[in-house]
């Protein structure tokens, strides 16, 4: 089939001349498509005697295979050339600075907790923790809070049943520590607490830090000196501070501590007092031998005062525009 050799030679020449994959595909269709030159050669077999058809078909298939191999080889060449051209056009300048990695930062409330733990750690306080699901004994009874106290009401406390609740303060940590450890005791107890309240200055969950010292000859003067030093260290100012008489069931005497704000108004920052003798008796400590003081403060409130934040809820909304200000 001399005409077949001419078709193969013509196909190979066209393949070599193709300058891109699209042109090469046109050659493939022209010679190997359904109506391609080589494909149509198969229709000529019917004109041959039956005994010659197998040999002639094999020759045609061999010709088609040669063209297909030439197509594959040329396609690889064209694709490789196109890739090299694209890589050359997209040369990376390795001297350019890379994409900047965004640095993370501590949440402002976490910053406050770390700062307070660092200060009291230098005074010999250790960090103590306890369960967030409490029983009414550790959350109320042991702290000299009677059954008729309003803090036990459903509208203030999240109750699971008649005796279990989400703790409303970290004071239960103090009770457990005093029951399991003999004086001298010097701890701070940070953690999440829960109260049924939600507005611009209250959230159902917030962070609290309580402190406790129990030892011989602990006085209110020790309490005042400790908190004076703490507040001036925390706010990094020589603040005007006042202790205002107050009432807490678990301390006697009790006080609330205010600092003078930049607007000339007093701002409440924490509550404190001398540990009530009944609380000491409840944990097996003799109030005739030992005394102590305790204090408690909201981490969000201190953070708001330190950074000038006006809405407590911003701490819980995870708005990066807000949080990035505290890096």
Curated annotation (Swiss-Prot):
The keyword Cell wall biogenesis/degradation does not apply. Gene3D superfamilies: Bira Bifunctional Protein, Domain 2. It catalyses: tRNA(Phe) + L-phenylalanine + ATP = L-phenylalanyl-tRNA(Phe) + AMP + diphosphate + H(+). One of its GO terms (molecular function) is ATP binding. Mg(2+) binds at residue 252. The keyword Magnesium applies. Pfam families: Phe_tRNA-synt_N (PF02912), tRNA-synt_2d (PF01409). Its cofactor is Mg(2+). Its EC number is 6.1.1.20. One of its GO terms (cellular component) is cytoplasm. PROSITE patterns: AA_TRNA_LIGASE_II. Keywords: Aminoacyl-tRNA synthetase, ATP-binding, Cytoplasm, Ligase, Magnesium, Metal-binding, Nucleotide-binding, Protein biosynthesis. SUPFAM superfamilies: Class II aaRS and biotin synthetases (SSF55681), tRNA-binding arm (SSF46589). Signal peptide: none annotated. It is found in: Cytoplasm. It is an enzyme of class 6 (ligase). One of its GO terms (biological process) is phenylalanyl-tRNA aminoacylation. Binds 2 magnesium ions per tetramer. It comes from the Bacteria. Belongs to the class-II aminoacyl-tRNA synthetase family. Phe-tRNA synthetase alpha subunit type 1 subfamily. PANTHER family: PHENYLALANINE--TRNA LIGASE, MITOCHONDRIAL (PTHR11538:SF41), PHENYLALANYL-TRNA SYNTHETASE (PTHR11538). Tetramer of two alpha and two beta subunits. This is Phenylalanine--tRNA ligase alpha subunit. The lineage of its organism: Bacteria, Pseudomonadati, Pseudomonadota, Gammaproteobacteria, Enterobacterales.
